[in-house]
Amino acid sequence: MLLTHLNEENQPKMVDIGDKETTERIALASGRISMNKEAYDAIINHGVKKGPVLQTAIIAGIMGAKKTSELIPMCHSIMLNGVDIDILEEKETCSFKLYARVKTQAKTGVEMEALMSVSIGLLTIYDMVKAIDKSMTISGVMLEHKSGGKSGDYNAKK
């Protein structure tokens, strides 16, 4: 497969998307943060001194999606139509699963924005609770679904 971010001299370049068609693009990404029971209970019971952890993670995830092109060198700056984040409580494993759905009308997809949104949301949870549990783990950050564009739809294997 040809790497599109390299020119003929094997040097980095940003792909020219000028001739591509503007279409609706949607991406859904997810990831998980696991922690000890004390940290999990502190989040659920709103006992974290830094404030409301899950609400802050949602805001951070939205900000992460908006800042993606500033942090990933070959990522195009695109207008986002919406970012929707859900955080599921997983009591039995003392973890939270974060989903980010990003939508746009553009010439390129929003997979990186969805993945960045998940990553920043989970890192925010870690930051806010690290005083209680430094051994938290972030895992399984992945693209679940994408639609729109020339390459068509993608659904992760379950």
From Swiss-Prot:
UniProt EC number: 4.6.1.17
Keyword Methyltransferase: no
Cysteine-cysteine disulfides: none
MF terms (GO), sorted A to Z: cyclic pyranopterin monophosphate synthase activity
A matching Pfam family: MoaC
Annotated keywords: Lyase, Molybdenum cofactor biosynthesis
InterPro entries according to UniProt: MoaC, MoaC_bact/euk, MoaC_sf, MoCo_biosynth_MoaA/MoaC, Mopterin_CF_biosynth-C_dom
Subunit and partners: Homohexamer; trimer of dimers.
Protein name, as recorded: Cyclic pyranopterin monophosphate synthase
